[in-house]
Amino acid sequence: EISLGLVGSEMCIRDRNDGIIRTDPSKKQITLVFTAADKADGADAIISILKKHGIKGGFFFTGEFYELYPDVVKRLRAEGHLVGSHSYGHLLYMPWENRDSLLVTREQFEQDMLKSYEVMRKAGIEYKDAPVYIPPYEYYNKEIAAWAKNMGIQLINYTPGTMSNADYTTPDMGAKYRSSKFIYDKIMEVEKKEGLNGHLMLIHFGTDDRRTDKFYNGYLDKMIKTLKRKGYTFVPVLEATGI
């Protein structure tokens, strides 16, 4: 399912759909990435926690987010974070039940990505600042990754296993709901069992109001402190991937 491929000078791990899902597994490094479509309730907490720990994150936003929250984008850029694309329209590229078929044409995909980079440029972000992107719903296939690559954009995604990406779930989801404590404990369990070397760890920049137990309130800070104590360094996206 997984192949090793050299990107730049770094050894990265790709999944079977050709997205980079882990950076160099021989290095005790973690990269924090954040996505948002239309919510920014985590802005103050996340910006201040990363500042406190001297960490540069990667932030991937939709076109709507850039239009709704220009001040948040400015703040992130002023702090030296990578601010990039999560697509323009948060399109669903494939049906959930069939990853091998497509709901978008290549032209629709390219138009959406061009719009995304256009709205980024208005915010002062050039292509060279953010040549990587996290696809909407973190859901893609080989064709999507190839189309992106053809535009000079490398598709990346979170390293599976820690369930950090479940921090968006809400109590009404029943069995799918994951509390912040559950997620924190799961991250530590994976660390203990196999380590988190090269992990791309995804956290949502904002979540639904129905979720009052926000991971960024308390647990994000605690997680960073614990992992630093265990000897991990937090490395920016482009440095970690060698792109």
Predicted segments, located by residue:
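Well-ordered, non-membrane alpha-helical segments in soluble/globular domains
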Residues: L114, S180-Y184, Y216-D221
